[in-house]
A protein has these predicted regions:
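Structured alpha/beta or helical-core interaction and ligand-binding surfaces enriched in interleaved
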Residues: 1-134, 138-316
């Protein structure tokens, strides 16, 4: 359940909204990277302090994808440089961060730098950053002092029923846990014998690929990211030229290949990049292409990693 008290924090005066709540005043929908942005962060900190919150959990973390809708250009590192290592270890679903780190994540989201996540503390406190510099804060406390402080900062904290980004409004698409039964299914497929391709989505828009065998399955399992979404595909095709020749002319696909050194890489391409792709994958051992269209993207099976207690808490 979402927290019982929710506020929409904005720089937009409610007096400029019509009877349906639509805003008709001057609207600057990007961060000023300055005093207004700082006011947002101070307001959120005030709500957290009044709610007794000193740590928040990262939920459904994402990075820049193939298509971006942000109003500002994404930056290298997705706005996470200095907060997490280059490999983004520590930025995963369920990771706990201090309020100061959470505020830096909010800053990156306000700036459309690429990263996005929900910030939550169970049903006690939530922070969600939406479009056009709208921030939604939920708390189990009414936070009257924080509301007043927000107004002092030149912003507006409007009471609302619920954040439009509340997780309760969305049904998870994946409800199967990657438990021992799942891994036995994988092991049975490998025993045919054959190899399989494992897609590990460790963040939204971030994947790693593993070529599975009976012998390396346990090794791969040991390095998978917390709460990752796992999709099992048929093995790569050793006839790379045939895979390249079969690329669709009017569709964007994920192209996955194994380099001569055994490294598995992938890139999202459309027809304008086919010639360049052929050069990039010269010498590849094997490859495949996977459609991005959901109605054409059918792995053999997929599931999400549960926590160490066996409970599936990931939301995919």
């Amino acid at each position: 359940m979402p927290p019982p008290f929710a506020h929409r924090i904005t720089k937009y005066d409610p007096a400029d909204r019509d009877e349906r709540g639509h805003y008709h005043g001057a609207e600057v929908t990007v961060s000023d990277h300055g005093p207004v942005e700082a006011a947002y962060l101070e307001a959120i900190a005030a709500f957290a302090q009044e709610s007794g919150i000193d740590r928040l959990e990262i939920r459904e973390p994402a990075v820049t994808g193939f298509v971006t809708f942000g109003l500002e250009a994404p930056v290298d590192g997705h706005g996470l440089a200095g907060l997490f290592p280059a490999d983004l270890a520590g930025y995963y679903d369920g990771a706990e961060v201090s309020v100061p780190v959470a505020l830096e994540l909010v800053r990156a989201m306000l700036r459309d730098q690429g990263a996005w996540c929900r910030l939550e503390q169970q049903d006690r406190f939530t922070v969600h950053v939406g479009w056009d510099q709208y921030v939604y804060v939920g708390s189990d406390q009414p936070c009257a002092a924080a509301v007043a402080r927000t107004r002092e900062l030149g912003l507006f904290a409007e009471p609302i029923t619920m954040s439009p980004y509340a997780a309760d409004l969305e049904e998870p698409e994946v409800t199967q846990a990657a438990d021992e039964e799942f891994w036995e299914r994988v092991r049975a497929e490998l025993a045919v014998p054959q190899m399989l391709l494992l897609e590990e989505s460790y963040l939204y828009n971030a994947t790693r690929w593993h070529r599975l065998t009976e012998h390396n399955l346990d090794t791969v399992r040991a390095v998978l990211g917390p709460r990752a979404l796992l999709s099992v595909w048929p093995d790569l095709n050793p006839d790379v030229d045939a895979v390249l020749a079969a690329l669709p002319e009017d569709e964007t696909v994920d192209f996955v290949w194994e380099a001569p050194n055994g490294t598995i890489s992938h890139v999202t391409v459309d027809e304008t990049h086919h010639q360049q792709l052929a050069t990039s994958v010269a010498g590849a051992r094997a490859a495949c292409s996977l459609s991005l269209a959901l109605d054409e993207r059918h792995p053999l099976f997929h599931a999400a990693l549960p926590d160490s207690d066996g409970v599936l808490r990931a939301r995919w």
